[in-house]
Amino acid sequence: MFDGHFVRISLLIRKSKQGATNIYKQIGWRDRTGLSALVTEKTEKSSGPLWIGPLCDSDIASRLTEEKAEQICGLNLKEMPTDWDQQRLNLVLREIRRSVRHIADAAPLLSQNHLLIPMDVFAKKSGRGGPPSIKKSIAILQSNGFEAARGPYPEPTLITNADESSVMHLLNQIQVNQN
């Protein structure tokens, strides 16, 4: 979960040879020349090693809504420090909601193999001007049978189970229609 420039994570540690082998299969490198090109070994144009497997448990993450986060983490007027006013409380509650926004919607995709595409990276890789609207990008992918959601990251990020060539083709259609 993003909190400013920090990322909070929760881990469950298990000892197992088979588990270690399964974990090792989820480690890879990302080829910087494509949106998602994963490679099995380090190359001159790759970053890594990186975790390339699912990012969360869908059942748990799908329950992490803005309302639930505010209920669990939020303060009320009685719990506030005495020097706080309603405006400061509202700011804290807004930040709590922002920190989990889009997690529940993206949970099914984050719990499986997926592409995670920052929209500004798409714009750069496609060779066009700016990126298309993330809402239009999600809509066109879903209308073509793919799953898609906005990622729970500060920058507009698309998460999908579509392959890279389908993403490039479909999102470039939006770009052409916007010009």
Walk through the language-model features, giving the residues of each.
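SAM-dependent transferase fold signal centered on methyltransferase-like domains
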Residues: M1-N179
